[in-house]
Amino acid sequence: MSLQCGIVGLPNVGKSTLFNCLSNAKAQSANFPFCTIEPNVGVITVPDERLNKLAELVHPQRIVPTTVEIVDIAGLVKGASKGEGLGNKFLANIRETDAILHVLRCFDDDNITHVDGTVNPVRDKEIIDFELQLKDLETIESRISKVQKQAQTGGDKAAKVTYEVLSRYKEALEQGKAARTVTFETKDEQKIAHDLLLLTIKPVMYVCIVDDNCAVSGNKYVDMVREAVKDENAEILILAAKTESEIAEFETYEERQMFLQEIGLEESGVSRLIRAAYSLLNLETYFTAGPQEVRAWTYLKGSKAPQCAGIIHTDFEKGFIRAEVIKYDDYIALGSENACKEAGKMYIEGKEYVVQDGDIMHFRFNV
């Protein structure tokens, strides 16, 4: 899947440091507002213990995890919607992503200059929200002027539906609400909404960057963010960038786990963030398991068996006959594919089967 999460935020809040932790890439991380001008793209392995447990049973020649793309986008400043700073570049880059990781500075550090002079993550959030909403409002007003007359005077049903969608978005945006807060019931409305490619329709997660000693429970700044986003149904993730940088330096899994235990964490913030980003993109995983490889495959939640087969190869979808499905828990409990067959735990599914997260699949096809 070529879906991407974009890391966004004001300059100097910790975006590039976070990106480096995620990908071990060397995006320039400097105390300078526009050190990330061209977006850095990292293909990040999604941690999944299920893959490792399957491999322990199957003993394949290789193990192939699934991945998600993370894009580090240049810092936005006030006036971006009008092209200020790197505004036009920022808006173009964010439009190409599928979900937003909104990074908020929740730490004090006199050595790292804040563009507005003081630390206030809620103000920072509102600056980004305002710029994105303003750009969306421009898009809506441009479109609405073109269809308004047709919708109000003619018999063009499509124009009327389009006008209704645009009007509802316009009302929400003028109230300072994101487009994602507006929902539509009919498929026609949903298609029109999707085709508008609005910036604030993208799902968002807030990543609060904190000091090392606040990595477990957060701080007063994180509490401010929680209060500000309580009605958004958005996830908040606390992450200490310096701690994560230290974790990334350890060579082995055992060393990392020992360090995490010492600082009171069960797993790294990076691992939690990657999984959360995967979920934010509405992605799930199915597995294939054989002596050559045990592999995780990414698919959009709600996909049916033929579409999931096509992720492996287009011929699998074109010539789809059936899917042989074993539930992950059954495979782990019984220990092998043959044992699952003998226990009646392999299910034969057809074209309408909606693949479930964790399914172990074998596709039959004929081209």
PLM region spans:
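C-terminal-of-GTPase-core extension/linker across diverse P-loop GTPases
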Residues: 2-8, 13, 19, 146-354, ...
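Amphipathic, soluble alpha-helical interaction motifs
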Residues: 57, 100-103, 131, 143, ...
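Short amphipathic alpha-helical segments
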Residues: 30-31, 112-116, 218-220, 250
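Switch/coupling subdomain of P-loop NTPase systems
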Residues: 89, 95, 99-102, 107-135, ...
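Conserved G1/Walker A P-loop phosphate-binding module
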Residues: 1-113, 122, 141, 147
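Flexible beta-alpha connector loops of hexameric P-loop NTPases
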Residues: 76-82, 117-132, 151-158, 264
